[in-house]
Amino acid sequence: MSQAIMKQAEERMEKAHLSLKKELATLRAGRANVSILDPVQVDYYGSPTPLNQVANVNTPEARLILITPWDKSMVTEIEKAIQRADLGLAPSSDGTVIRLAIPPLTEDRRKELVKLVKKYTEEGKVALRNIRRDTNEQLKKQEKDGVLTEDDLRGYTEDVQTLTDKFVKVLDQTAADKEQEIMEV
């Protein structure tokens, strides 16, 4: 039972890490990355549809994203969707494909992005602390119900703290990697 609680805590912490990675992937770091277009929803015959379901999206060059719609009549709709998403990118089209040139980041914008990275990382750490608190409460309840001894509870509580420390380091490393990517000129 207690092992199941520990396993659940580890899975939840891994999800918090994956959530941070996904959040950081949407930050534009000066290099073309198709994941910055993840929030773009295209009005496809009346229903909002993710961009990657109506077009082929790839990066032929370091600072260029090429969007090739499968239905050529969707070109203007895709352009509008990109502008509505407010990504700070100006789409240019030749009627069949859409090009998104990724401008180099200014120093001020880099600093703003690093602040965002820190904010997202802190949110991830708060999630980890909440998971730790929930797990410790579940373990204390088991001790109160007589399932765990006081010594077992202490051991599991230390294990939860070790697990939390491990994931805090993972989050910090993920953030440091993203900050380095952003600050690269």
UniProtKB/Swiss-Prot annotation:
Keyword presence, S-adenosyl-L-methionine: no
Keyword annotations of the record: Cytoplasm, Protein biosynthesis
InterPro entries according to UniProt: Ribosome_recyc_fac, Ribosome_recyc_fac_dom, RRF_sf
Gene Ontology MF: a single term: ribosomal large subunit binding
Main location group: cytoplasm
Keyword Protein biosynthesis carried by entry: yes
GO cellular component, one term: cytoplasm
BP terms from Gene Ontology: translational termination
Subcellular localization(s) per the UniProt record: Cytoplasm
Top-level taxonomic group: Bacteria
Function: Responsible for the release of ribosomes from messenger RNA at the termination of protein biosynthesis. May increase the efficiency of translation by recycling ribosomes from one round of translation to another.
Family to which the UniProt record says this protein belongs: Belongs to the RRF family.
Protein name, entry field: Ribosome-recycling factor
